[in-house]
C-alpha cells in the first residue's frame, strides 16, 4: 500500500499492470462505468471504453493535429472498439497502419496511463484511488480538461520532424519516457520498415476535413448544392445537405458509417487552432478562422 498526495494506491503484484489501465477520480466528481458514460467524446473516456466511432475520432484527431496524409492511417483496419484497441501490441499497430503504427501505439499508451498530454496536469493533491485486484477495472478514467488536445508539448512532436520522413520506420516520440513499460518482445521484433506514405503540409486535395470543406466551396460545379457561401468576404458558409457532405467525407476516409453528427464533432477540433469558427445562433453555419488558408478570392 502506498500513501501519496492524500490518496491510497493498492497494487497487487500478481497482476500485469500493462493491461490494467488506471482509474482516476478528482475531488469534484467520480465517473462510474455503470452510469452510462460511454456516450461521451473520446477524450473524456478511458481508451478501453471507447466505441469504434470514438476510435475513429481519435485517429482523425491524430491525422489533423500532426498534418498527416490520410493514407498514413487506414481507417478500415481499425473497425474495432477501445477494448480491442488497447489489447493491440506495437507489432499489430504497425501491421495495421504501417510506420504510423508507432505514433498510434505511443499516443494510446500515453493516454492509457496519463489521461493528459502533460503529466504535470495531475497534481499530487488529487485524491487518487487505484484498485487492481480484479481483472476488469471498475472506474473509467475521465479527463475534465480538454486543453490537452492541443498541448504543444505533445501534439506538436511530429510537426518538429521532417515531414518527408515522418511515415518511415524511425519515428521519434518524446512520450516514451512517460510510459511505465519495459521493452517487450513485440518492440524488439519490429525492425522491418513497412511501405512509405507521404506527408504534404499544404495539400490542395482536401486531405484534412477543413480543406475538404473548403474545396467543396471552391468547386461548386463538382459538388453542387452541398455547401454554399453565406458571406464569401468573411468566410461564412452554410451546409445545405449536411448528411451528403458527411457521406462524401466518409467515402474519402473509407468510413461507411460517417454521419453529420460525427463530422461536426470533428470540426470542433479546429476551433482552438483558429481554422474554423462556430457562428452562434445559426444552425449549420460556420466560418473560416484566421489560420485557414486558400479560401479567399484574392489569395494565392
Curated annotation (Swiss-Prot):
The record's note on its domains: The PNT domain acts as a transcriptional activator.
Keyword Transcription: yes
Top-level taxon: Eukaryota
Name recorded for this polypeptide: ETS homologous factor
The keyword Nucleus is assigned to this record: yes
InterPro entries: EHF_SAM_Pointed_dom, Ets_dom, ETS_fam, Pointed_dom, SAM/pointed_sf, WH-like_DNA-bd_sf, WH_DNA-bd_sf
Localisation per UniProt entry: Nucleus
A Gene Ontology term for the protein's cellular component: nucleus
UniProt DNA-binding region: 207-289
Ranges annotated as biased composition (Basic and acidic residues): 185-195
Pfam families on file: Ets (PF00178), SAM_PNT (PF02198)
Lineage: Eukaryota, Metazoa, Chordata, Craniata, Vertebrata
Region of interest: Disordered: 183-202
Family: Belongs to the ETS family.
Main location: nucleus
Native species: Pan troglodytes
Record domain PNT: where: 29-115
Function noted in UniProt: Transcriptional activator that may play a role in regulating epithelial cell differentiation and proliferation. May act as a repressor for a specific subset of ETS/AP-1-responsive genes, and as a modulator of the nuclear response to mitogen-activated protein kinase signaling cascades. Binds to DNA sequences containing the consensus nucleotide core sequence GGAA. Involved in regulation of TNFRSF10B/DR5 expression through Ets-binding sequences on the TNFRSF10B/DR5 promoter.
Gene Ontology biological-process entries: cell differentiation; regulation of transcription by RNA polymerase II
GO MF annotations, alphabetized: DNA-binding transcription factor activity, RNA polymerase II-specific; sequence-specific double-stranded DNA binding
Keyword entries, A-Z: DNA-binding, Nucleus, Transcription, Transcription regulation
Amino acid at each position: 500500500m502506498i500513501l501519496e498526495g492524500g490518496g491510497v494506491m493498492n497494487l497487487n503484484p500478481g497482476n500485469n499492470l500493462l493491461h490494467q489501465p488506471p482509474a482516476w477520480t478528482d475531488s469534484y466528481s467520480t465517473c462510474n462505468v455503470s452510469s452510462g458514460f460511454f456516450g461521451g467524446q473520446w477524450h473524456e473516456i478511458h481508451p478501453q471504453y471507447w466505441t469504434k466511432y470514438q476510435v475513429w475520432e481519435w485517429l482523425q484527431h491524430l491525422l489533423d493535429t500532426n498534418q498527416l496524409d490520410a493514407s498514413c492511417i487506414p481507417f478500415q483496419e481499425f473497425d474495432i472498439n477501445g477494448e480491442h484497441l488497447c489489447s493491440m501490441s506495437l507489432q499489430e499497430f504497425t501491421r495495421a497502419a504501417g510506420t504510423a503504427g508507432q505514433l498510434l501505439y505511443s499516443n494510446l499508451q500515453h493516454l492509457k496511463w496519463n489521461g493528459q498530454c502533460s503529466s504535470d496536469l495531475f497534481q499530487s493533491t488529487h485524491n487518487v484511488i487505484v484498485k487492481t485486484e480484479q481483472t476488469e477495472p471498475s472506474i473509467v478514467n475521465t479527463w475534465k480538461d480538454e486543453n490537452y488536445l492541443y498541448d504543444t508539448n505533445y501534439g506538436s512532436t511530429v510537426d518538429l520532424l521532417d515531414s518527408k520522413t515522418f511515415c518511415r520506420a524511425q519515428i521519434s516520440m518524446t512520450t516514451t519516457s512517460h510510459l511505465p513499460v519495459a521493452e517487450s518482445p513485440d518492440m524488439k521484433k519490429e525492425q522491418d520498415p513497412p511501405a512509405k506514405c507521404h506527408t504534404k503540409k499544404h495539400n490542395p486535395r482536401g486531405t484534412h476535413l477543413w480543406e475538404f470543406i473548403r474545396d467543396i466551396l471552391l468547386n461548386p460545379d463538382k459538388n453542387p448544392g452541398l455547401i454554399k457561401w453565406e458571406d464569401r468576404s468573411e468566410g461564412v458558409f452554410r451546409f445545405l445537405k449536411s448528411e451528403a457532405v458527411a457521406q462524401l467525407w466518409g467515402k474519402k476516409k473509407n468510413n461507411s458509417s460517417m454521419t453529420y453528427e460525427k463530422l461536426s464533432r470533428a470540426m470542433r477540433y479546429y476551433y482552438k487552432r483558429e481554422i474554423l469558427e462556430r457562428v452562434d445562433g445559426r444552425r449549420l453555419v460556420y466560418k473560416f478562422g484566421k489560420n485557414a488558408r486558400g479560401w479567399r478570392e484574392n489569395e494565392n
